[in-house]
Every structure is written in structure tokens, then in C-alpha cells.
């Protein structure tokens, strides 16, 4: 959510956060506080995908999360029941194709794949992403888990994938030490700010100067490096540098 709300938008452009975690989404009951029940979201694309209508149905499932109703920062809510993931087998590939070409509609997309979505059937979304991000705490427990997940990601995605780390502070290990140990770039370091984070995860009341707080400032700063990574990859592949597709590989 922090990236969605801070991503820089050119005139006429929009950004989508797609919750594609096979273990279920968190935005509807969390940030949106259950205000939309389960009327929109990923589950509704299963039937559309089987009928060859996913390209049209996708846009109807997006939810505006801006206060002004500008519809330039949108969410595709995830599954409310993980059991529904089994019906999405053919949908992942169709979504990947849609996201790959989404720039023609002046949209960028951030894909949240949760803890295990970057492997298995939904991994095609990570394979097609410009940048894959793994979120981890800078504690020993967090980094041990990250090391195992990074190895699995690299096996799944191959050597050409751009994999970066997002660190959540709270442990003793520094950025440089983590980069050396895990052999991955730390793209962003987010401060441990539970009160500010609760606004994004649970729809809590915003504290004073939330937009200028440490958490949102750190998220905003990270977008600069992310856009550089996207441009570098696209230059290497001979693609336009604007916009991008990002996937979160783990949380």
C-alpha cells in the first residue's frame, strides 16, 4: 500500500496494486475496513478467464483508494478464501499477459504475491515482472528465512531476474552486511513504525502528518531506485523505459 500511495504518476497515468497472494488478500478487511464486502476482486476473474473475457472483466474489479475519487490509484482486492486459489490456474498466465501490456492503457502495476506466490502456479507473474521485491525484517530470524526464499526465487526465476530486498528495521543487521550476505541489493529500508503502518494494513486513523512521516518518506524515496532498475532492465531488453511492473515475492 505504501508504494501504491507514493508511486510518482505522470499526467494521465494510473497505478494498480494487484493482490495476487494465493493465501488470500488483506486489503478489503484491512485498509478498506470491510466497506466493500467481497463484491470486487481476484476471485471474480476466474469465470471471466475461463470464458476468455478477463481483459474486459479486470477493469471492473478495480477499487479506487484515493480520497478524492480520482481513480488514479487502484486496487485489485485479493482472495478472501484461499480455497478459491485452485480455480485460478489458467488465470495467472492471462493476468501476466495483461500486466505485460498494461502500459498501453497508461497504467503501471504492483503485484503482491505474498509469502509463496512467487513460486508455484502464480509464479508467472514474478517471471514477467520488471523487478521482484522481497520484504524482510533485518533480524536473524527474518534473514534466515529470506536466504531460503531468495534461493527458491532464483531457482524459479533464473539468473536474469532483478531481485531486490525491502528491509523493515527492528533488528541489528545493517544494509551493507545484508547485501553482502544475501547477494541482493537492498532497494529500500522502511522504519519500524507500527502506528503509521497500521493506517495501511488495518485502516487505522491517520496520525498527524502521516504523509510526511518516516514510513511514507521512506516508501517515496524507494520509488526512485525502483524506477531506475526498471529503466535499466528495459534498456537491456530494448523496451520503452517508462512505467513498470513490480512483484513482491515475500512478506
Map each language-model feature to its residues.
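A conserved segment at the C-terminal end of the G1
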Residues: 1-18
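Short amphipathic alpha-helical segment that frequently serves as the phosphate-/nucleotide-binding helix
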Residues: 1-3, 92, 147
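Helical mechanochemical/support elements of P-loop NTPase systems and associated helical scaffolds
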Residues: 8, 91-94, 141-145, 211-218
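P-loop/Walker-type NTP enzyme "switch/lid" segment
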Residues: 17-101, 196-201
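Short, hinge-like loop/turn segments at secondary-structure boundaries
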Residues: 32-37, 152-153, 205-208
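Serine-centered coil/turn micro-motif
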Residues: 41-44, 119, 139, 213, ...
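Conserved catalytic-core segment of NTP-binding enzymes
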Residues: 94-99, 103-191, 198
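C-terminal lobe/tail of nucleotide-utilizing enzymes
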Residues: 155, 159-251
Amino acid at each position: 500500500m505504501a508504494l501504491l500511495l507514493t508511486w510518482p504518476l505522470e499526467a494521465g497515468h494510473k497505478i494498480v496494486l494487484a493482490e495476487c497472494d494465493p493465501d488470500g488478500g488483506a486489503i478489503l478487511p484491512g485498509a478498506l475496513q470491510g466497506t466493500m464486502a467481497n463484491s470486487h476482486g481476484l476471485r471474480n476473474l476466474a469465470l471471466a478467464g475461463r470464458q476468455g473475457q478477463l481483459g474486459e472483466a479486470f477493469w471492473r474489479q478495480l477499487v479506487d483508494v484515493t480520497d478524492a475519487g480520482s481513480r488514479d490509484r487502484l486496487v485489485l482486492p485479493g482472495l478472501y478464501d484461499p480455497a478459491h486459489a485452485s480455480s485460478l490456474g489458467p488465470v495467472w498466465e492471462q493476468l501476466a499477459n495483461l500486466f505485460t501490456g498494461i502500459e498501453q492503457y497508461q497504467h503501471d502495476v504492483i503485484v503482491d504475491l505474498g509469502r509463496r506466490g512467487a513460486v508455484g502456479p502464480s509464479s508467472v507473474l514474478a517471471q514477467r515482472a520488471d523487478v521482484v521485491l522481497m520484504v524482510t525484517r533485518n533480524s536473524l530470524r527474518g534473514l534466515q528465512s529470506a536466504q531460503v526464499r531468495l534461493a527458491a526465487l532464483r531457482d524459479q526465476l533464473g539468473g536474469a531476474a532483478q531481485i531486490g530486498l525491502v528491509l523493515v528495521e527492528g533488528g541489528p543487521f545493517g544494509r551493507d552486511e545484508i547485501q553482502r550476505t544475501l547477494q541482493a541489493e537492498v532497494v529500500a529500508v522502511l522504519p519500524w513504525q507500527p502506528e503509521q503502518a497500521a493506517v495501511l494494513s488495518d485502516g487505522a486513523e491517520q496520525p498527524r502528518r502521516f504523509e510526511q512521516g518516516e514510513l511514507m518518506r521512506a516508501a517515496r524515496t524507494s520509488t526512485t531506485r525502483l524506477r531506475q532498475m526498471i529503466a535499466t532492465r528495459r534498456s537491456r531488453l530494448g523496451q520503452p523505459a517508462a512505467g513498470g511492473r513490480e512483484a513482491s515475492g515475500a512478506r
